[in-house]
């Protein structure tokens, strides 16, 4: 096997990287396809003349080339093609090798040398055309020229195109079919001594064959004369010299439309005149002269005209010229600021202040909205133009220049913008006046609108779209898709929340107050823990939270043991929270009646002078129940056992059942009275130590009608009267958290000023010492645990009773005394006194309730505490006055 065949076999295993490494060592060009690189190496082995041409200054022998190929191949075998013969690792010295004397072979046609000077011989410095279909070699000194003759040799450009390739790109509407006259360089004929312009001229002949003449018979074929400045800053355009004089077969032809002495600007373009009418079959003569010192080349070509659609077909389709990801990255970079220059000195106001950026989709060429978004690929901005309009205008102007940045390119750089073209495609059915969109830094967009009517007309286009054109989820959709977390609602109902009182019926049918659970087993204690050390009190406020402010959230103050629901029929119940449920049968039909002998002394400290004093009606006079508090009752006797379901207690839906079992009482249960005694008065608060016979012995002739649902399973005798409801003591020395009538974990102690007005003032030391001498109750309750407020006397007018003087009323006296139920009426009215409505409150209209008193205006200033303290004194006088 000879040397050339051996190297050819080894080169077949080389990759492009290895081939370029070998060519680098040989000093040859590395551009081209793989087969071209292989042929370039094999040429050095087969043809000495071509080797001398390719290697330029260095001459290499066949043996040196073969050794270089062999070393590279051996390294590929050893290292698995990972360590390549590159970066000076080849030890062969190719710089000092000389070509051995061998007979010269004819020049191979693969090595094309075509220069404007007309010389096809190689020189020491040559440059190759970048066009893959051309790859001709030209002399550097002939085509790379300085701007001024005295500037010296300019550096080689990064990319080089020969004059033929530049001409093809200058006007894509003309397709070159043949070159009857190859490019020739104009030469200076005279050099004036007076500094005038140098005259240059060239005269050539070209031949038009019969086949060319047949083509010219078709309307789309023509013969065109062209001229080009070799060192033009705008590569892809024609330019004629100053004072150009063109003649074809002796016929003058106008070459330019500008004045002869005017230079062509950067944005200007010259056209190539059509000389078809001036030529004839056979040999034709053409000459060109001009007064210009610059170097031009001149030629004649046979061309075919392209249609507009054919030129548009040259532009790659959407997504092929540029990927969508690259286009989106450019838009984000431009919207984010900097205009594509990622330098630290970029000072973009858009990046600082704008949430989105307005983009106008009007074509800068036509002024109408862009239909097909086109742009030049090398441009760093995001501006676009209408592709169809742009190409059509360039059919005459031949100015392939970006209308935004004014940089010059060729038709091969035009692409369809994949980002903006999706937007314009969605807007094709919009009105032509809709031309603006808003783009966010992430690339999402929407059509800009100024009025609500425009938004409705745009429809979905007025909403934010993702960069790919899909709709972005709106805030409503996001809210709908949010995960709904389960919320545990304890003691809450959809309607008005009920007031829950810590009372229940014992085995004897007596209503009793829940004692503090010292062992921590009650439901409220399990929820409250041990952070609160003060008592629960009854708020004299319409606030649900005990804060003293009307309209608080009714969802709080719901954690009581049981429910005690009242219906006020539109009247404001100052002594009960807003959490009143109207679903239970506790009507308050406060009707106006004669005042009788009940007289109420009102001391008001409020700012209003028109406080109304409502005289109590005979609610319970004559054993009537219309104005009282009605509890429906079942027949006497305990029919059903008490509901011991702890879940019903904790849930707040067990009616008046307040205790899981009897263990929640610290005192023995009292016996149910066998008959219904008449109550001498109403005991709202009790501090007597003796409650063994019943917590309160106050009854009424009318039945207490409580439904089984409210009683929690207990029933009472029809003749059993309304019993007074004891309230928790006001002592602050106790440490239990739920020692209150109202089992509300949020209203502890005396934190809320609105609660102060319904509590007795704290007794002084002398008053307290009087209570210390009293004996403790036999059932384990201390006398300090109960406080009494006397709300009037019996019908017999017994004001001199010692038990009522100091507010202490024994159970024996209560069980034996006879009287009317006026005090019960007064207490029920006190509990159920509400204003008719919010509108009636504004008009200062009060219900006919015996103990409904004017409320002061609540304010947020520092006088609230003093005002409520004065109101406390007023209430005490009202309650203690009774009936005189």
Curated annotation (Swiss-Prot):
Gene, per the UniProt record: SIZ1
UniProt cross-link Glycyl lysine isopeptide (Lys-Gly) (interchain with G-Cter in SUMO), position: 100, 488
Disruption phenotype: Dwarf phenotype. Heat-sensitive phenotype. Early flowering under short day. Elevated level of salicylic acid (SA), increased expression of pathogenesis-related (PR) genes and increased resistance to the bacterial pathogen P.syringae. ABA hypersensitivity during seed germination primary root growth. Exaggerated prototypical Pi-starvation responses, including increased root-shoot mass ratio and greater anthocyanin accumulation.
EC numbers: 2.3.2.-
Protein name: E3 SUMO-protein ligase SIZ1
Family statement: Belongs to the PIAS family.
Bias (Basic and acidic residues): 837-847
Annotated CDD domains: PHD_Bye1p_SIZ1_like (cd15570), SP-RING_Siz-like (cd16792)
Reported function: E3 SUMO protein ligase involved in regulation processes. Mediates SUMO/ attachment to PHR1, a MYB transcriptional activator controlling the phosphate deficiency responses. Functions as an upstream negative regulator of salicylic acid (SA) accumulation and subsequent SA-mediated systemic acquired resistance (SAR) signaling. Probably not involved in jasmonic acid (JA)-mediated defense response. Participates in abiotic stress-induced sumoylation. Controls heat shock-induced SUMO1 and SUMO2 conjugation and facilitates basal thermotolerance.
GO molecular function annotation: SUMO binding; SUMO transferase activity; zinc ion binding
Organism whose genome encodes this protein: Arabidopsis thaliana
């Amino acid at each position: 096997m000879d040397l050339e065949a051996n190297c050819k076999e080894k080169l077949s295993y080389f990759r492009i990287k290895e081939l370029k490494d070998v060519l680098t060592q040989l000093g040859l060009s590395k551009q081209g396809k793989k087969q071209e690189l292989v042929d370039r190496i094999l040429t050095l082995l087969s043809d000495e003349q071509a080797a001398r041409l390719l290697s330029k200054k260095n001459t290499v022998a066949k043996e040196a080339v073969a050794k270089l190929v062999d070393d590279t191949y051996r390294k590929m075998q050893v290292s698995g093609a990972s360590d390549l013969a590159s970066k000076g690792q080849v030890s062969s010295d190719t710089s000092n090798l000389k070509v051995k004397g061998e007979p010269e072979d004819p020049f191979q046609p693969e090595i094309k040398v075509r220069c404007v000077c007309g010389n096809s011989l190689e020189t020491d410095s040559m440059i190759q055309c970048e066009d893959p279909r051309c790859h001709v070699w030209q002399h550097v000194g002939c085509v790379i020229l300085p701007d001024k003759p005295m500037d010296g040799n300019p550096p080689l450009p990064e990319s080089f195109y020969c004059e033929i390739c530049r001409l093809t790109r200058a006007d894509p509407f003309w397709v070159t079919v043949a070159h009857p006259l190859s490019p020739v360089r104009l030469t200076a004929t005279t050099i004036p001594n007076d500094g005038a312009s140098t005259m240059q001229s060239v005269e050539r002949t070209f031949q038009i064959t019969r086949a060319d003449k047949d083509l010219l018979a078709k309307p789309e074929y023509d013969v065109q004369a062209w001229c080009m400045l070799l060192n033009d800053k705008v590569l892809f355009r024609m330019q004629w010299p100053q004072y150009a004089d063109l003649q074809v077969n002796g016929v003058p032809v106008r070459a330019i439309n500008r004045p002869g002495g005017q230079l062509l600007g950067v944005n200007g373009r010259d056209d190539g005149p059509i000389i078809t009418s001036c030529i004839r079959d056979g040999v034709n003569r053409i000459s060109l002269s001009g007064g210009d010192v610059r170097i031009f080349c001149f030629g004649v070509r046979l061309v075919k005209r392209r249609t507009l659609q054919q030129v548009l077909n040259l532009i790659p389709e959407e997504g092929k010229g540029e990927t969508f990801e690259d286009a989106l990255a450019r838009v984000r970079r431009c919207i984010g600021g900097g205009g594509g220059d990622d330098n630290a000195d970029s000072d973009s106001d858009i990046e600082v202040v704008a949430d989105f950026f307005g983009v106008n989709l009007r074509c800068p060429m036509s002024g109408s909205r862009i239909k097909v978004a086109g742009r030049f690929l090398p441009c760093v901005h995001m501006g676009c133009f209408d592709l169809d309009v742009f190409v059509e205008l360039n059919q005459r102007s031949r100015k392939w220049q970006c209308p935004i940045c004014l940089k010059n390119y060729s038709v091969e750089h035009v692409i369809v913008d994949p980002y903006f073209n999706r937007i314009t495609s969605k807007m094709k059915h919009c009105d032509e006046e809709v031309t603006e969109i808003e783009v966010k830094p992430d690339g999402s967009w929407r059509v800009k609108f100024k009025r609500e009517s425009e938004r409705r007309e745009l429809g979905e286009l007025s909403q934010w779209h993702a960069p790919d054109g899909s709709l972005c989820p709106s805030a409503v959709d996001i809210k709908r898709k949010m995960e709904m977390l389960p919320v545990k609602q304890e003691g809450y109902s959809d309607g008005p929340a009920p007031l829950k009182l810590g009372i229940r019926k014992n085995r004897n049918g007596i209503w009793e107050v829940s004692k503090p659970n010292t062992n921590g087993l009650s439901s409220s204690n399990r929820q409250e823990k041990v952070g609160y050390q003060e008592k629960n009190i009854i708020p004299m406020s319409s606030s649900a939270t005990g804060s003293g402010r009307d309209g608080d959230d009714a969802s709080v103050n719901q954690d009581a043991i049981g429910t005690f629901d009242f219906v006020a029929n539109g009247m404001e119940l100052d002594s009960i929270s807003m959490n009143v449920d109207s679903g239970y049968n506790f009507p308050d039909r406060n009707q106006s009646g004669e005042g009788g002998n009940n007289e109420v002394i009102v001391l008001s400290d409020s700012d209003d002078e028109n406080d109304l004093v409502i005289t109590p009606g005979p609610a319970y006079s004559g054993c009537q129940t219309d104005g009282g508090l009605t509890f429906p009752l079942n027949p006497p006797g305990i029919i059903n056992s008490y509901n011991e379901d702890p879940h019903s207690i904790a849930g707040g839906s067990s009616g008046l059942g307040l205790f899981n079992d009897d263990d929640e009482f610290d005192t023995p249960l009292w016996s149910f009275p066998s008959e219904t005694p008449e109550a001498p008065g109403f005991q709202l608060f009790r501090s007597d130590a003796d409650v063994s016979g019943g917590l309160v012995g106050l009854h009424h002739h009318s039945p207490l009608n409580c439904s089984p649902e409210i009683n929690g399973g207990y029933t009472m005798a029809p003749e059993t009267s309304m019993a007074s409801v004891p309230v928790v003591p006001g002592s602050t020395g106790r440490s239990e958290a739920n020692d209150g009538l109202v089992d509300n974990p949020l209203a502890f102690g005396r934190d809320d000023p609105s609660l102060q007005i319904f509590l007795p003032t704290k007794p002084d030391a002398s008053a307290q010492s009087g209570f210390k001498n009293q004996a403790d109750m036999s059932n384990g309750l201390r006398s300090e645990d109960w406080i009494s407020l006397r709300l009037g006397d019996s019908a017999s007018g017994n004001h001199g009773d010692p038990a009522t003087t100091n507010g202490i009323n024994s159970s024996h006296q209560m069980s034996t005394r006879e009287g009317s139920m006026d005090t019960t009426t007064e207490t029920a009215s006190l509990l159920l006194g509400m204003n008719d409505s919010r509108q009636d409150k504004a008009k200062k209209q009060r219900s006919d309730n015996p103990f409904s008193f004017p409320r002061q205006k609540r304010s947020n200033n520092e006088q609230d505490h003093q005002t409520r303290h004065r109101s406390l004194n007023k209430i005490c006088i009202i309650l203690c006055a009774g009936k005189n």
